[in-house]
């Protein structure tokens, strides 16, 4: 898996955001994945909880952009961590640190861990 292919996984996720459908986003996550979201204090542990988070997050009209990516691969596992910025429909923006951990399931790459936290400054 090349760095470009891992970067494309973020583009796929960001495109799913643009659909406005939380179910489409949740399908990119393993059923037992963990989401530590940007704009919520609640850790999400499954598709139902992940959909619930994105249902609220999508109401803001987010568009993501990676500012810095650090990609590493370990066989069936790939990690993309760095900084991204979400711009919202109302013109506001939030910069956050992120980590996506992907696992190859034999057919496609799935998100198994996603941690996103607003920059402290």
Question: Model-found features: residue ranges?
Answer:
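A beta-strand edge to alpha-helix "cap/lid" segment located at domain peripheries
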Residues: 1-24, 34-121
């Amino acid at each position: 898996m090349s760095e470009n292919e891992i970067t494309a996984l973020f583009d796929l996720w960001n495109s799913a955001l643009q659909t406005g459908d939380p179910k489409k986003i949740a399908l990119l996550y393993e059923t037992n994945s963990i989401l530590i979201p940007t704009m919520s204090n609640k850790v999400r542990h499954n598709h139902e909880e992940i959909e619930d988070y994105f249902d609220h997050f999508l109401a803001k009209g987010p568009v993501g952009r990676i500012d810095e990516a650090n990609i590493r691969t370990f066989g069936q596992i790939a990690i993309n961590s760095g900084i991204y910025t979400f711009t919202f429909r109302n013109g506001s923006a939030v910069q956050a640190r992120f980590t996506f951990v992907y696992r190859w399931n034999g057919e496609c790459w799935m998100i198994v861990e996603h941690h996103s936290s607003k920059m402290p400054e």
